[in-house]
């Protein structure tokens, strides 16, 4: 790996950019050595590599699209084990984590929509008595966490509880697909670690928000996806939900102190109710988070340091010596205007420049 010097960059730390400084990258890590030698770039705003906490892998082109928009880590939320294995650790591409296939009830609407996806049978859990074996199989195949789709109709509470208990017994966090308020309540009773999606039917209220915060639950609201669902149904003339409950839920949860993580639900699945675009949609998501009440710096943290804290990615998400050199150089300051995350001048993944002139 080559040694790289970035000169006169303003580095994002603790919610703000500092005075211009020189930064050294060596061996794929951020180095504290003196910044001697020629500089690869000069000037700009340097932020940690962005993390999309909800994507669905499709192929190498998925990773290329993510990287082009500054997304250096993607948290897949349901993909067949062979696909995940083929995409893990590819040099110079977005790094990934995955639960492999998400747990689905054979009776759920989600399963009916997704039944033609390759290896979807591996996602099905017949009931609570099958939870241990299902989680064991996914853990043995290398799942980084477990995802449970809570759909109504779908799993009963006993099965959700069993899946969460089996995952926690193996030291794995649990992400719950919960796009309706009753699904959020089921996830809450089961003690999941991460909620994904913000409900479209009814907003989370202050009391429930306080209870969720007390248990340490966090949320990836995927506002870009929720907005896309609403817009797609409206375009078809189909009576459906409105976006405001999702936005209001984020505002309430944020006010209650819940950590908000940025994720899009980017996918290329024909049966999906909406398909946010890989990479580009994360910038849309950050803007929607700001619209829901986060400051631009809080939205940026939702796609960097806060995301790493809750998915066990301690080697990234901040800019400090010894950490993985996943970096994005911007032309403008995103703490002033969050749309500046789109002004990408350069992207480094594990110290290798993948966007911008070498």
What are the language-model segments listed below?
Residues 1-4, 10-48:
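Histidine-rich, glycine-flanked metal-binding segment
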Residues 9, 28, 43, 54, ...:
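Divalent metal-coordination and catalytic microenvironments
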Residues 9, 321-358:
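C-terminal cap of metal-dependent C-N hydrolases
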Residues 64-172, 208, 215-228, 232:
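Divalent-metal coordination cores built from histidine and acidic residues
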Residues 148-247, 268-270, 293:
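Active-site core of metal-dependent hydrolases
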Residues 246-330:
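His/Asp/Glu-enriched, well-ordered alpha-helical/loop segment
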């Amino acid at each position: 790996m080559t040694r790289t010097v970035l000169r006169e960059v303003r580095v994002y730390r603790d919610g703000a950019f500092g005075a211009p400084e020189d930064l050294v990258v060596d061996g794929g890590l951020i180095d504290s050595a003196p910044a001697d030698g020629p500089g690869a770039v000069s000037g700009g705003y340097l932020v940690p590599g962005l993390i999309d906490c909800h994507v669905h892998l499709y192929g190498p082109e998925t990773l290329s699209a993510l990287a082009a928009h500054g997304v250096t880590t993607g948290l897949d939320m349901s993909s067949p084990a062979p696909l995940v294995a083929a995409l893990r650790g590819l040099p110079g591409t977005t790094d990934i984590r995955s639960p492999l296939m998400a747990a689905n009830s054979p009776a759920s609407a989600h399963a009916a929509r997704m039944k033609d996806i390759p290896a979807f049978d591996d996602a099905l859990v017949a009931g609570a008595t099958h939870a241990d074996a299902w989680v064991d199989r996914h853990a043995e195949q290398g799942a980084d966490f477990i995802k449970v789709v809570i759909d109504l109709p779908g799993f009963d509470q006993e099965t959700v509880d069993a899946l969460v208990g089996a995952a926690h017994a193996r030291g794995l966090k649990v992400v719950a697909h919960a796009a309706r308020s009753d699904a959020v309540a089921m996830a809450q009773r089961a003690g999941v670690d991460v909620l994904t999606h913000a409900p479209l039917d009814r907003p989370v209220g202050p009391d429930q928000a306080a209870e969720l915060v007390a248990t340490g639950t966090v949320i990836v609201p995927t506002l870009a996806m929720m907005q896309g669902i609403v817009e797609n149904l409206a375009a078809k003339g189909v009576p459906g939900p409105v976006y405001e409950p999702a936005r209001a839920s984020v505002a309430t949860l944020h006010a209650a102190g819940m950590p908000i993580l940025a994720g899009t639900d980017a996918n290329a699945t024909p049966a999906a109710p909406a398909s946010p675009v890989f990479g580009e949609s994360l910038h849309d998501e950050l803007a929607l988070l700001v619209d829901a009440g986060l400051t631009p710096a809080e939205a940026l943290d939702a796609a960097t340091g806060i995301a790493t804290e809750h998915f066990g990615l301690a080697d990234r998400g901040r800019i400090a010596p010894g950490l993985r050199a996943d970096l994005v150089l911007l032309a403008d300051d995103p703490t002033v205007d969050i749309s500046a995350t789109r002004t990408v001048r350069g992207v480094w993944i594990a110290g290798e420049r993948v966007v911008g002139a070498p």
